[in-house]
Amino acid sequence: MANHFSQLAKKSKTNGNSEKIAKEQTGKPSLEIYKLGDDVLRQNSKRITKVDESIRKLTREMIQSMYAAKGIGLAAPQIGINKELLVIDVNFEDSAAEPLILINPEITDYGTTLNSYEEGCLSIPGVYLNVVRPSTIKLKFRDEMGRPRKMKADGLLARCIQHEMDHLNGILFVDRVTSKDDLKKELIKEGFHEKDVISIT
């Protein structure tokens, strides 16, 4: 998810453990981030059956790439790996806050309140459009050591988790945009094609 939410991000909290990676990255992401139109973004991801050092290495590379791209979330499919793995840090401007690592995440409950808010995506750079999502969620997942976890999330964190989890099912945020005129205009402006959107609204 693209970092377009600095004011809300300052009010959000994350939890998780990971090797400390500097957030002020320069240069290009170490991993290629695939863009709208690439087939890999439309595939369903597979569950991770064993959380080992190779998975932890991948999470570190994803976190570095997310920071280098100035993002607040990145899903494994965005780097061409169809595994159920997400890294998130909505506290991008807080150097002390640790990123959240979600392995095999599953949302167990959605709140009843819906909110519309502007989203962006590292796979669709430059495009920012409103998307309606539940404002609160509960989920279960495994951390980078393979331990089962549960958590509640609201606000920007809940939105970012839902956005990144969509990637695991081959869904992009533009698929959820209801204003088709705005969608078409933004896509054309940034050089993307409307035919690559699969509307689910």
UniProtKB/Swiss-Prot annotation:
It comes from Prochlorococcus marinus (strain MIT 9312). GO terms for biological process: co-translational protein modification; translation. Coiled coil: none annotated. The active site is at E164. NCBIfam families: pept_deformyl, PRK00150.1-3. Its cofactor is Fe(2+). One of its GO terms (molecular function) is peptide deformylase activity. PANTHER family: PEPTIDE DEFORMYLASE (PTHR10458:SF22). Its EC number is 3.5.1.88. Belongs to the polypeptide deformylase family. It comes from the Bacteria. This is Peptide deformylase. Residues 1-24 are annotated as: Disordered. Binds 1 Fe(2+) ion. SUPFAM superfamilies: Peptide deformylase. It catalyses: N-terminal N-formyl-L-methionyl-[peptide] + H2O = N-terminal L-methionyl-[peptide] + formate. Removes the formyl group from the N-terminal Met of newly synthesized proteins. Requires at least a dipeptide for an efficient rate of reaction. N-terminal L-methionine is a prerequisite for activity but the enzyme has broad specificity at other positions. Keywords: Hydrolase, Iron, Metal-binding, Protein biosynthesis. Fe cation binds at C121, H163, H167.
